[in-house]
C-alpha cells in the first residue's frame, strides 16, 4: 500500500506537462490530443485515490489482462501496461504534432520520467508490448528533431542522453542506434553552434556509457561526465569567454547527476548503512540473498555486484510479467540473464562501432561531392572512432568480435579516408591508425603490415614533392607513437624480422633520414624553404624519439626479471597529445591493466635465438632477391646455395610464384630461358596452376598476373606452348588439341594489347577477332558465340599483372630491401580517385583490398610476438645506427640553429645510451667519437656556440650514462682534459710543461721563435701572452695528442678568435663534477672510468716537450672519492691504478716520476687511515707500486724518495699497518741490494728503527710479514758496502729469535702458513713435496709461522762466501735450535730439518751425478784444482761443523724428533756415498758420533733403520774398476802408445800435437777412474771399520736379525773385493799403469780380508752368545752361513795358491815396454796377507760344536786336504791347520773308525 505522498510523485511530473500541452494545443487541430491529456489527468487523480496494488502483492491475484507496465511511481507501486499506455499516449502524440510549444512540455515530461526512474524496462521494437511501447516513446522523441526547431534540439538531446544514462530504462539494439543517429543528425543539421557542440558532447557521453558498461559487463557501473573543454575543436573555441563550453559542460553534468540524484537517496535509505555504498541497497529486497559470497569483498565491489544483481532482477521481473510464471532453478536463471546482459551490452557496443565505421565511410553523392555537411558527418564519425580507440578498455582490445569488426569495417574506413585530400580527414585517419598500432597491433598484424606503408611510409619516403601538411601530420604522429617504447620494438620484431613482411622500421628510419637531410641538390621540389626547414626539424625530432623509445624500452626490460610469459609490462599505453584526451570515464583502469592485452592474439614472446635466426634468414633472402632482380640466374644459384630455395624445379617455381619483391619482368625472362634448369622450372611453374573449369581468358589472366611476358618471341613461344598444353590437360574437352589453345592464346594477347593500348587508333572488332581465328581448332572454327563472349570480356577487362597496380609505387620508392609491395595499394586508391570511375569501382577496390589482407595474413607469420628479449634491440641498432649518425652529424656540423643543435645532441645522447647498454662497442664509439669531434676542443680556433653545446652534451653524457660507457670513457675524459687545458689557457695560467718538461726539451724550447707573443694578447697579461699560443692549432681530432706539440705560426686574427672563443668556455661550468660524481658509478663502471682516466693521463704525460698532469691529479681525486667502496671493488680499481703508477714512477721525466710517487704517497696515507682486518691483503696491494718502482727505476732520487715515503707512511700509521708490512720490507729488501751506498745506509737505518721500536707490530697479524722481515735482514747481510751492516743484520736475527723464545709476540693462532716469500731458499719451497707436514698438527702450531722464516734465513746465510758471516749464521742458527728446541713440536722439527738444516747439505746430497763427474773430468786441471781447494775448504769448515751440530741436535731432542731418524741417516749416507774421501769420512765420523751419543736410545726398529742405512752405504760405495775392462780403455791405450811412438819419431810433426791432446784426454779419464776407485776403496775400509766400532759399542743391544743385516752388508763388500782381486786381466792392466795407481796387487786385498774377518767375528759371536737363545731355525741359519763363508775363504785361498803357473804364462806375453814385477815374490806376499784370514777361518770352524763340525766335515775335509798341498807364504797357516787336524778332525775320524 502506497502513501499519498508516494502516489503524488508521478502526477507531480505528468499532470503539469499535460496541462501545459492542453493549454498550448489548438482545440480544432489537436482536440483529440487535448482530450487524451484530460483523460490521463483524470486517471491519475483516480489512481491517487485508489492506488493499484503492488506487484509483489498482486502477482498471484492479477489476471493476465493486467500485466505490469513500464511505468511506476518511483516506489513499490507499478502501473499496469494499460495505464502506462494511457499515460504515454498523449506524450507520444504531442511529440508528433510538429509544434514546438506542444512538443517541448511533452519531451520535458518524458525526460523527467526517465531521470527520476519512473520508467523502467527495455526499449526494443521487436520485443513485447512493454518494449514496443518504450520504443515508440523514444522514437517519438527522436522524430522531434525532424521539426528543425533549434529550441527543441536541446530537450531532445537531454531526453536521449537521460534515456541512455538511465539504469531503469534500458536502451539496446535498434533503439540505441536510433538515439545515436538522432544525436548525429542534430550535430549535422543544427545551425546553432551551441546545439552542435552539445550534440557532439552528448554523442561522446553516450559512447562512453555504452562502452564503459560493455567493459564492466554491467549497466550499473558508475559513469563520470566527460570533460567538454578537452573535446573542443579550434573553431569551437572561438568563444574566448568560454561560456559555450561551460554551458555544454553543465548540460552534460546535470543529466549525469540527475540519475545519481534519483538513485542515491533511495540507496542511502537502505540497510547498507554507508553513503559511499552507492547502489548497495537500492532494490536489494527483491534480489540479494543472505548467502551472497560477495561478503568476502570490500564494500565498493559489493556495491557494484549488488547493483548488478538488481539489474538482473529487473530482467527477471520483466520475463515473469511477460510469461506469467516462475521457473525452478533461480541460480541458473541468474547466470543466464547475466550472460544475456553481457551479450546485449557487447552487441550494443558492436552496433554503435559498426555504425560509426559506416558513417565514416559514407561518400557524398556525385552532385554534392563538396557538401560540407557530409564532410562534417564523416569528420564527426572519425573523431568518435578516434576517441573510442584511444580509450579502449581490455574487453574492446582483446575481444575477437571487436577485432573482427575492426578488420571488416574500420580497416575499410581507413582505406577510403587515408587517401583523402582533406587534411582533417587524413589527420583523423592517421590518428585512428596510430591508435590501432598502439593498442590493437597484437590482433591486427596483417592489417598493420599493409596500412603502415600505405599511410605512413608512403608519405615519409616522399622527399622531393610531398604534401607539406600531410607529411607534417605523419611526422607528428610518428613522434607521438614513439612515446610507447614497446611499439617500435614490436614493429621491428614482427615485420622487419618477418620474411614475408616489409621492413617497416628500417624504411621508416631511412625515410626520416632523407627527410632530415632535405631535398637532394638539383631535384625539383614543391616545398618552400621554411617548409623544408620545418620538415627537417620534425624528422629529426622523430629520429630522436625513436632512439629515446628504444632506450626507454631497454631500461624497462633490464629492470624486469626475464619471463617467458606475458606480463603487465606488455601494456600498450600511449598519450597521443592534447588532441586525444583521456576521458574521465574510468577507462584508465582497463588501460593500465594489460594482462589481457595479447591474451588472445599473441602467440608468445620473443626468443633471442629465434629472433637472430629470423633476422639473418630475412637479410640473406633479401640479398638473394636483390641479386635475382639484377641477374636472375645468379640470384637463383645464390638462394639455392644459401638454403633459401630447394634445388628441385618445383621448389624454384614455387618460390618464383609466391615470393614477394621479385621483378616480374625478370621472372618472365628467367622462365623463357632455354637452359635446362630454367626450362624445367618453367614447366614446373606452369604445371602448378589448376585451370580446371576456367574460361580461357580467365586462365590466361591467372597465369600472367605473376610475371610479365618477355620481349623475345622464342621465350614467349616456349611459355605459351606450355600454357596451352597445361590448359588442355586440365580442360580436355574445350579444344581438339593443344595447338588450338596455343594459337588462341596468342590471339588473346594480341587482342588485349590492341584493345587497351592508347596508341592503337583502329581497334579490332569482334568480327575481326573471329575472322583472325578461323580454322584454328584442327581445321574447324571455334563457336562464334564463344569467341564473341571471349572478345567482350577481354575488351572490357584488361589482362594485367598484379605489378601493374603497383607500378607508380615502385617508381617512387624502388628499394631492393623491400620485400612486400602491399603498400602500393594506396596507389590504387589514388589512381581511382583521380579517375572518373572512383565511386563506380569502390566496391571492386574494397574486394581487392580484402584479398590483399587475406594474402598478407596467409603469407605472414600468424603469431604476433611481444618483444621481451633485449637482443632484439641489437638488430634494431644495426639497422638504424648509420642513418641516425648521418642525420645528426650533418646538421650539427653545418647548422647554427640552437634548436636543431639541441635536437641533434639529444639524438646523440639517446643513441649512445642504447648502444652502451647493449655493449655495442663499434656503434657506441661511432657516436661518442663524433660527438667528441663536434666539441672542436682539438681546434679551439674554430669553437662556436654549437661546440659549446656539444661540450655540455658530453658532460651530460658522463653524468647520466656513466655506468654504461665502458671504454668510451676515454673520449669523454679526453674532452674534459682538453677543455681544462683551454680553460687554463684562457685564464693565462702557465702550462704544466713549465714545471714538468725535461731539461733537454726546455733547452730546445728556448730556441723556438717567439712570434707567438702578439699585441692582441698583451692586454690579457704576461701569463696569457706567454702561453696562449700553445693551444691554438692542434690539427685533427685523431692526430692530436693531449700533451700537444709546438703549433704552427699563428696569425693575429686567429689569435683574436682564440681569445674570444675561450670566453665561450665559461658557459660550460665546472668540469670537476665528472670526477666528483664518479663515486655514484656502479662497480663495473668505476673500473672502466679509472682505466680510461689512466690512459688519458698517459697520453698527457707522453709528450716530452709539453707534459700535463691534469688527469694525474684527477686520478688522486677519484681515488679519494671512491676509497669507501667495498674492498672487492677497490681492489679492482687499485689493480688498474697500480700499473699506472708503476709506469709513471719509472718515467724518464724525473719531475713527473717524483710527482707520481708523491701522489701515490698521499693516497697511501689516506688508505692507511682505514683499518684492515687480519688475513686481508689490501694494504699490500696498495703499496705494491712502491716495490715495483723501487726495483725498476734507474733514478737514485726516485728510489730515495720511495724509501722516505714508505718510512713516513709506516711510521706515522704504524697502528693501522697490517699487510702493508710486506710491501714495506720488500722495498727495503730491494734497497739492500742497491748500487748506491747512501740508499743502503738510509734503508738500514730505518729498518733498525722499525725492528727496535715496532717489532711487535710486525707479527701481530700477517704470518708472512715476519718472513719478509727475515728476508730483509738477510738481504742487508748480503750487502756489499758494509760488513758492519751485515753483522748487525745477523744480530737482529738473533734478536728476533730471542723475542720469539720470550713469547712476547702475538701468536696468530687463526692464521695458516702461506709458504715463504721473498728470498727464502728454493729448497725450502720444495722440501715438503710429500705434503705430510702441510696437514694435521702443523696448521695449529703457532711457532711455525715465526720460527721457520727465521731459521730459513739463517740457513741461507750458511752459504755466504764470507767466513765471518757464515760462521755467525751457523752459530746463531744452531744456538737457537739448541737453546729453544724444547719449544718445538714434531711438525715444526720436521719442517726445520727438511727446509732449514738439510738444505745446508743439498750440494752434497744431490751431487752424485755421473754427468757431473764427466763434466768435471773434461775441465782443465788447473782451474779444477783451484776450485776443489776452495770447495774442500768449505767442506771441512762448514760441513763438518754443521753435520756434527745436526747430529748433536738430533740426539739432544731425540725424544721429540725420533721419527726423523730415517731422514738423518739418509743425510749421513748421502755423505758417505759422495765420491770424495774427505766428505765420506765426515759422514762416517758423524755416523759413528751419532751412534756413540745415542747410547741406549734406539729401539729394535730404530736399530733396523741404522743397520739398513749401513747396508745401503756399503752397497753403493763399492769400488768400480769397470773402466779398465772396457773397450774404450783398450782403444785409448793403443792410441796413446801409437802417439808416443809418433812423438818420438817426429818431434815437430803436426800429428804430435793431436796425439798429445788425445793422450791428455786419455790421462784425464784414467785419472778420474783411478781416483774414484781408490776413493771408494778407502771409504769402504773406513765404513767396515766404523761398523766394527759400532758393533763393539752396542754388541749386547744388537739382535741376531740386525747383526745378520750387517753380515750381509760386509759379505757383499768382501765378495765384490774378491771379484776385483781375482780378475787377473784387471790386475795386469793396473800393474801396467805402474806407480800411477799407487795401488798394491791385488788392489782390494785388505778390504777383502777385513770384510771376511769381521763377518767371521760377527758369526762366531752369534754362535758363541748362547744367552740370546735364538730360535733353532735362526741358529741353524747362522751356522750354515758361517760354514759357507769358511768354505768361500778356503776356496779363494786354494785358488790363489794354485794359480801361479797361469799368472806366469800371462806375464810372459806382456809387452816388453810394460813394467814387470817378479810374480813369485808377489805371490808370496799375497798369500802371506791372506794367511791371517785363513788362520781365523780354521779357528772359526773349530769353534763349532762337535755335532755341527761332524755334520759339515764332509764338505770341509776336501778343502783341508787341498790346503795341505798349497804353497804357503807363512807358517801360520800350517800351524793352524795342524792344530785343527789334531784337535778337531782327528777325534772325528777316530770316532768314525
From Swiss-Prot:
Asked if Transport is a keyword of the record, the answer is yes
What job does this protein perform?
Activates the ARF proteins by exchanging bound GDP for free GTP. Plays a role in vesicular protein sorting.
Q: What is this protein called?
A: Brefeldin A-inhibited guanine nucleotide-exchange protein 2
Which residue positions are annotated as catalytic? 712
What gene is it encoded by?
Answer: BIG2
* Feature: compositional bias, Gly residues: 270-281
Q: Composition bias, kind Low complexity: at what positions?
A: 55-66
Q: Which residue ranges does the record assign to the SEC7 domain?
A: 610-797
UniProt keywords, alphabetically = Acetylation, Cytoplasm, Guanine-nucleotide releasing factor, Membrane, Phosphoprotein, Protein transport, Transport
GO terms assigned for molecular function? guanyl-nucleotide exchange factor activity
Q: Please, which domain of life does this record's source organism belong to?
A: Eukaryota
Record's PROSITE patterns? SEC7
Q: Where in the cell is it found?
A: Cytoplasm, Cytosol; Membrane
- Self-association and partners: Homodimer.
A Pfam family this chain is assigned to: Sec7-like_HDS
Q: What Gene Ontology terms for biological process does this UniProt record contain?
A: Golgi to plasma membrane protein transport; regulation of ARF protein signal transduction
Which stretches does UniProt call biased (Polar residues)? 284-294, 594-605, 1311-1327
How does this protein sit in the membrane? Peripheral membrane protein
At which residues is Phosphoserine found?
595
Q: How is its activity regulated?
A: Inhibited by brefeldin A.
Span list, region Disordered? 45-71, 266-299, 579-606, 1311-1333
